């Protein structure tokens, strides 16, 4: 796809709420990233999928190979290729929220891996609406199967020697969640917090007041060195966002 086509797609179909459109353009123009690294004893890969440049994450214990996939929004075969290349046994597929660009690959990935799907109870109704929602933007997505379990504030999910904590951050959607790995010092923020921006709040269940309040009280209180990996665009840190994010008083 050409750069002009990508610019047109973003500018015409995704409103520039809180700078998100510009953030997405930067992601897409960088091309389809598929980056991998080991963070201590953990395999960590970012797989950019779909025309909206969603960051899908593969996390796994480097010894036991138990792992999770977060937000397989599209291009399930690309996600499954990363799973296979790393020899990962996927225990769970987690959705940060239920918007179509983050859930479009749920069905294929869960069917191929046998992983249990998890999403918040508030956002679960979106799972059966992905195809219809995508057509509103001239795109396509598969409806998702129902979840095996619901995510809620304070839940802990283990894979190998690693553990993530669920943090409920409403505002981009009613049931938006972030995933915090304290030992590894990283946060998967979905579409709640971006590099020097926040998620759009003009969709059903959205509220800028709720979103900003939750980010300030639940995310900006994490250690400043915590690395933040958002649903679109480049990584950042809690310290950087406290200082420079204009939507958070930075």
Language-model features, listed with the residues they occupy:
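Bacterial N-terminal signal peptides that target proteins for export
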Residues: 3-18
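Metallo-beta-lactamase
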Residues: 88, 133, 162-250
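Conserved beta-strand hairpin/beta-sheet module of binuclear metal-dependent hydrolase folds
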Residues: 39-86, 178-190
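Active-site HxH/HxHxD metal-binding segment of metal-dependent hydrolases
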Residues: 74-162, 243-247
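Short, glycine/acidic-enriched loop or turn micro-motifs at the edges of active sites
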Residues: 64, 74, 100, 123, ...
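Bacterial N-terminal signal peptides
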Residues: 18-27
């Amino acid at each position: 796809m050409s750069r002009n086509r990508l610019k047109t797609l973003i500018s015409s179909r995704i409103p520039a709420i809180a700078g998100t459109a510009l953030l997405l353009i930067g992601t897409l123009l960088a091309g389809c990233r598929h980056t991998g690294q080991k963070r201590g004893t953990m395999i960590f890969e970012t797989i950019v999928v779909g025309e909206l440049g969603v960051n899908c994450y593969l996390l796994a214990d480097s010894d036991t190979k138990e792992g999770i996939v977060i937000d397989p929004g599209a291009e399930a075969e690309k996600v499954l290729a990363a799973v296979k290349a790393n020899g990962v046994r996927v225990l769970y597929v987690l959705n940060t929220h239920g918007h179509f660009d983050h859930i479009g690959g749920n069905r294929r990935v869960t069917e191929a891996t046998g992983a249990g799907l998890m999403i918040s109870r508030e956002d679960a109704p979106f799972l059966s609406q992905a195809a219809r929602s995508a057509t509103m933007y001239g795109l396509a997505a598969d409806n998702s199967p129902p979840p095996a379990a619901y995510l809620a504030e304070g839940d802990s999910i283990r894979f190998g020697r690693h553990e993530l904590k669920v943090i409920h951050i409403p505002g981009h959607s009613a049931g938006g969640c972030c995933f915090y790995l304290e030992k590894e010092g990283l946060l998967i923020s979905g579409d709640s917090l971006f590099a020097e921006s926040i998620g759009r709040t003009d969709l059903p269940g959205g509220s800028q007041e709720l979103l900003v309040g939750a980010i300030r009280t639940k995310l900006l209180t994490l250690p400043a060195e915590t690395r933040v990996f958002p649903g679109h665009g480049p990584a950042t840190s809690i310290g950087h966002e406290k200082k420079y994010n204009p939507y958070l008083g930075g």
